[in-house]
Amino acid sequence: MKLAGLSREVEENLNKGSWIRKLFDEGARLKKEFGEDQVFDFSLGNPIVEPPEAFKRALIEEAEKGSHGYIQNQGLLAAREKVAQFLGSRFEADFSAERIVMTVGAGGALNVALKSIVNPGEEVIILAPYFAEYKLYIENYGGKAVSCPLTSRFEIDIEAVRQSITPQTKGLILNTPHNPTGTVLSQKNIDDLGALLKEIEEKSGQTIYVLFDEPYSQLIYDEELANPFQSYHRVILASSFSKDLGIAGERLGYIGLDSRMPDADLLINAFVYCNRTLGFVNAPVMMQRAVARMDDLRVDASAYKERRDLMVDILKEAGFEFEMPKGGFFVFPKSPIEDEVAFCVHAAQKYKLLIVPSSGFGMSGHFRLSFSVPIEQIKNSRDIFISLYKDFA
């Protein structure tokens, strides 16, 4: 399809499309035609747990004050102080409000960070399978995304990372709990990564940043969140309240640096500058004011764990193979046939079951499904998953 007037890059990416968005649109079409209760949509990772009542009360009280003007680009001091306290407690590291930047979601945080550190032609390693937008975020600023496979257990392959590093490497995006697999990286695995990056810096003087993308960090069921700040000294944390507070549509995130980061003040100045010049200006003010009033910045994760447990039991009963998801709200089973796209198309056409092929995440042979859906949908999908697997057994 030729699209007149668009940039070549955008035209090419529009023609490629996104499997997640395609399935989102297909789901809307099927629901309109057959009714919502007849479509089993596991395609989109949308939080299902409502924000805490304390957040809603804080939002109402702040709305009544009617303060909606511009604020400083870095974000409200009270919100940054709350985030610094939150991060310091979680990671047992030294964070301060001066080294926090409030952003438009974690996506905004990553774009601000990448714009600040990546020169055209420099490389950023992404660990496959990966969140599809990573590649586009990197390319937004003339960078090159370098795909490096995780192990078969979806852990960091340290030797593969070593082989992926070149003199042009500027960063590596680290995501745990992991989208799309639901795995949670161990402290040793991240320690080994940190040791590798420190070895390279000591030998060559090369600066490589770890961009720690952790929006699912409050949704961990069977493990503890590893601490990259104890493993490496050049960590840029990018996160959001989308899942922590169940406010994905409100687009409130942040960047955080701990006291060990060299040139932290210079980086923060760059982040604030890019927050403005990329057009974000400042993160949503009402959301910042509400967060600043919160005592606990998390939802109850038990509803997600209940759904996780039910979903994996159904998949096991049907015969699917997968790594147990220990965080987030995704499962990443193996496709029973080599062509996972054909498998997902079959699921949609025969069963009105929407699941995402792994080719949308930079690898083949799997599919992703989200258990952040109504629990009745999971229960009612049991016979469908059993029948779907039998179609290819």
UniProtKB/Swiss-Prot annotation:
GO molecular function: L-aspartate:2-oxoglutarate aminotransferase activity; pyridoxal phosphate binding
Modification N6-(pyridoxal phosphate)lysine, positions: K243
SUPFAM superfamilies, per database record: PLP-dependent transferases
Record PROSITE patterns: AA_TRANSFER_CLASS_1 (PS00105)
Record keywords: Aminotransferase, Cytoplasm, Pyridoxal phosphate, Transferase
Cell compartment(s), UniProt: Cytoplasm
Chief location: cytoplasm
Enzyme superclass (EC): transferase
A Gene Ontology biological process term: biosynthetic process
Reaction(s) catalysed (UniProt annotation): L-aspartate + 2-oxoglutarate = oxaloacetate + L-glutamate
Pfam families: Aminotran_1_2
A Gene Ontology cellular-component term: cytoplasm
PANTHER family the record matches: ASPARTATE AMINOTRANSFERASE YHDR-RELATED
Protein known as: Putative aspartate aminotransferase YhdR
Originating species: Bacillus subtilis (strain 168)
Gene from which this protein is expressed: yhdR
